[in-house]
Curated annotation (Swiss-Prot):
Phylogenetic placement of the source organism: Eukaryota, Viridiplantae, Streptophyta, Embryophyta, Tracheophyta
Complex and partners: Interacts with SCP1.
Similarity field: Belongs to the protease inhibitor I3 (leguminous Kunitz-type inhibitor) family.
Pfam families, per database record: Kunitz_legume
Annotated site location: Important in determining the strength and specificity of the interaction with its subsrate: K169
Record key words, sorted: Apoplast, Disulfide bond, Protease inhibitor, Secreted, Serine protease inhibitor, Signal
Signal peptide annotation: 1-24
Protein name per UniProt: Kunitz type trypsin inhibitor 111
One Gene Ontology cellular component annotation held by this UniProt entry: apoplast
Subcellular location: Secreted; Secreted, Extracellular space, Apoplast
Principal cellular location given in the protein's record: secreted
């Protein structure tokens, strides 16, 4: 192999590595495109038969819980709003704190932004509810992050707002499900619910 051919081969591989690494830093949707923070997406369970579409679920009264509805064909779309916004970049990055907001209204007259609820006395789990944080967890309850699983295009959602408060000590957790009275609710502190993002 000539020196020029070898140099071209090395440069092509370095370029491919750089491109692959930069794409790997972003959340990608079901079409393989980076998820953008100004677009609506449906969050789908990556494992079919795992409960249906993400939606608002009534557990007791207001606020609504975030859950899955097997009878809802679409569920509600969400908007992802990063804690640190870069005006020149619309893509949602992996492992960065962000807000998850359902694009829907409620009869509770409150925000449909996801937040971490208090630990449930019966299940010991922390449910994902909606509304602006009322300082239940030091006003950091509305910040979640998306992390890659070993499978391309499949992610976990975590609550661990260390970007919002780097010096804080959080009891971090990954979002999973709880089945309660015929309802499927999202909660931390159990098995993870792998998800995919589908552009609306």
């Amino acid at each position: 192999m000539s020196t020029i051919s070898f140099t071209i081969f090395i440069l092509a591989n370095v370029w491919l590595l750089v491109v692959t690494t930069s794409i790997a830093q972003f959340v990608i949707d079901t079409s393989g495109e980076p998820v953008e923070n100004d677009e609506d997406y449906f969050i789908r369970p990556a494992i079919t038969g795992n409960g249906g579409s993400l939606t608002l679920v009534t557990r007791n009264s207001c606020p609504f819980n975030v859950g899955l509805d097997p009878d809802a064909p679409q569920g509600f779309a969400v908007l992802l709003s990063p804690f640190v916004s870069n005006r020149e970049e619309d893509e949602v990055r992996l492992g960065r704190d962000l807000r998850v907001i359902f694009q829907a209204g409620t009869s509770c007259g409150q925000s449909t932004e996801w937040r971490l609820g208090e630990r449930d006395a019966t299940t010991g789990r922390r449910f994902i509810i909606t509304g602006r944080d009322d300082s239940t967890v030091g006003s950091y309850g509305n910040f979640f992050r998306i992390v890659q699983t070993p499978s391309r295009g499949i992610f976990n959602i975590q609550w661990c707002p260390t970007e919002v408060c780097p010096s804080c000590k959080f009891e971090c957790g990954t979002v999973g499900i709880v089945r309660e009275n015929g309802k499927i609710l999202l909660a931390l502190d159990g098995s993870a619910l792998p998800v995919a993002f589908q552009k609306e």
